[in-house]
Amino acid sequence: MKYRDLRDFLQQLELRGELKRIATPVSTHLEMTEIADRVLRAQGPALLFEHAVHNGARAAMPVLANLFGTPRRVAWGMGADEVSALRDTGELLASLREPEAPRGLRDALGKVAMLKSALWDMAPKRVRGPACQEIVWEGADVDLARLPIQTCWPGDVAPLLTWGLVITRGPNARRQNLGIYRQQPIAPNKLIMRWLSHRGGALDFREHARAHPGTPFPVAVALGADPATILGAVTPVPDSLSEYQFAGLLRGSRTEVGQALGSDLSVPAWAEIVLEGHLLPANDPRAVAPVVPEGAPPPPDTGYEMALEGPYGDHTGYYNEQDWFPVFTVDRITMRRDPVYHSTYTGKPPDEPAVLGVALNEVFVPLLRRQLPEIVDFYLPPEGCSYRLAVVSIRKQYAGHAKRVMFGLWSVLRQFMYTKFIVVVDDDIDPRNWNEVVWAITTRMDPVRDTVLVERTPIDYLDFASPVSGLGGKMGMDATNKWPGETDREWGRPIAMDDAVKQRVDAMWGELGL
């Protein structure tokens, strides 16, 4: 599917029956979550709440939800016609991350053309007077309560900004980083920026604090960017390529960007809403001293304004514990005329992150095969909270091969740093079929011999099951057939009917009345 911006994408969804406009008044407080959750579980359409009720009154803009509620809509957002076509996207990313040696002159010319297209032809295009700056709120007009920010769950501490595309640049970086991080409003012009320590935005911020201590760190947050740009921020794009360039490759046209009004950051020109501002040093007059509740740990000494975030309902299906994160002070809000506010919720799978994980499986397979060619297929079950459990099938070649694959998966992509469980099966097992996977685990695996346990590894801080916040264990399960050296026993022979018998039964089947 080809499109220019979010509005164009929504128009095409509506023509395909994949967008439902809702004129009934619906509250941003809990009601939208319940409706979106029911529709997503039924694999229903994207939802545009045209009469959103926020803080007791009609909101000034509609709310878009469930945009990526099915794998097919994710594929359309990435410029593909079907989910299976995302394998081609993965092949492209694999080539950009680690190009193979050309097999001849024609192949070499093709690779040069592909790299030229990725690195030059799809470089972002800077435009003047971008649509995202048609309306500007500054000074006293900056009030986050004017945006219909959703309150997702009864135990949430506050509304939650969810689909914000956070734009940062480190002091030594040639390109900007784009990431999706949730944000908690704590004042009319302040949000808590909840990014995990290994994410690109957090890395850029730490580099800035080291290189320019005591100076504000510029940040922009785009809401309602085009789907290719949004999805580029959650895809393992190589460090040599910006998410804007990757979005251009997906879309088939260069990403148009405009310069933020208060910094040199480039923002999506067709985004619906953009928040501009800074992370402020703790001694800045605009910074607010942290409030430490009784019994809570003190904030880390970062030299910057910090606040205690949460609790919120998360993709695990539980409320997460509180933790300290930097505060984003919003200097201005820019937007298009008649903007659309893009929102989502996270909860017990399936939710939108889980659906994204299902679609991105197809992207991951070629990337993983480039490092581990023995991989046949790879699957992140949505009920595994997007990334916490992986099943991988391999062409086993030697004793201990499954264990090598486990450690390779934990290392090859940052996305799998927090994967707690990896199940390795042979290539006769479909990793996407739980009946087959469970059969392999229960027949080909000894719990003691074939289980790998690793202690004190990086883990998602939202994982309350880990003994220490941010550090926890990992388990690998070798559910492959065992080779000499792995067992001294005679291995089981699979049961199978003779082909001749099958053919005779096929011939008589129509006479059996079955």
Swiss-Prot record:
<feature type="binding site">
    <location>
        <position position="243"/>
    </location>
    <ligand>
        <name>Mn(2+)</name>
    </ligand>
</feature>
<dbReference type="Pfam" id="PF20695">
    <property type="entry name" value="UbiD_N"/>
</dbReference>
<feature type="binding site">
    <location>
        <begin position="194"/>
        <end position="196"/>
    </location>
    <ligand>
        <name>prenylated FMN</name>
    </ligand>
</feature>
<dbReference type="GO" id="GO:0046872">
    <property type="term" value="F:metal ion binding"/>
</dbReference>
<feature type="active site" description="Proton donor">
    <location>
        <position position="314"/>
    </location>
</feature>
<dbReference type="Pfam" id="PF01977">
    <property type="entry name" value="UbiD"/>
</dbReference>
<keyword id="KW-1003">Cell membrane</keyword>
<keyword id="KW-0210">Decarboxylase</keyword>
<dbReference type="InterPro" id="IPR049383">
    <property type="entry name" value="UbiD-like_N"/>
</dbReference>
<dbReference type="GO" id="GO:0005829">
    <property type="term" value="C:cytosol"/>
</dbReference>
<dbReference type="InterPro" id="IPR002830">
    <property type="entry name" value="UbiD"/>
</dbReference>
<comment type="function">
    <text>Catalyzes the decarboxylation of 3-octaprenyl-4-hydroxy benzoate to 2-octaprenylphenol, an intermediate step in ubiquinone biosynthesis.</text>
</comment>
<comment type="similarity">
    <text>Belongs to the UbiD family.</text>
</comment>
<dbReference type="GO" id="GO:0006744">
    <property type="term" value="P:ubiquinone biosynthetic process"/>
</dbReference>
<keyword id="KW-0464">Manganese</keyword>
<dbReference type="GO" id="GO:0008694">
    <property type="term" value="F:3-octaprenyl-4-hydroxybenzoate carboxy-lyase activity"/>
</dbReference>
<protein>
    <recommendedName>
        <fullName>3-octaprenyl-4-hydroxybenzoate carboxy-lyase</fullName>
        <ecNumber>4.1.1.98</ecNumber>
    </recommendedName>
</protein>
<dbReference type="InterPro" id="IPR048304">
    <property type="entry name" value="UbiD_Rift_dom"/>
</dbReference>
<keyword id="KW-0285">Flavoprotein</keyword>
<comment type="pathway">
    <text>Cofactor biosynthesis; ubiquinone biosynthesis.</text>
</comment>
<dbReference type="GO" id="GO:0005886">
    <property type="term" value="C:plasma membrane"/>
</dbReference>
<comment type="subunit">
    <text>Homohexamer.</text>
</comment>
<keyword id="KW-0288">FMN</keyword>
<dbReference type="InterPro" id="IPR023677">
    <property type="entry name" value="UbiD_bacteria"/>
</dbReference>
<keyword id="KW-0831">Ubiquinone biosynthesis</keyword>
<dbReference type="Pfam" id="PF20696">
    <property type="entry name" value="UbiD_C"/>
</dbReference>
<keyword id="KW-0479">Metal-binding</keyword>
<keyword id="KW-0472">Membrane</keyword>
<keyword id="KW-0456">Lyase</keyword>
<feature type="binding site">
    <location>
        <begin position="180"/>
        <end position="182"/>
    </location>
    <ligand>
        <name>prenylated FMN</name>
    </ligand>
</feature>
<feature type="binding site">
    <location>
        <begin position="199"/>
        <end position="200"/>
    </location>
    <ligand>
        <name>prenylated FMN</name>
    </ligand>
</feature>
<dbReference type="InterPro" id="IPR049381">
    <property type="entry name" value="UbiD-like_C"/>
</dbReference>
<feature type="binding site">
    <location>
        <position position="177"/>
    </location>
    <ligand>
        <name>Mn(2+)</name>
    </ligand>
</feature>
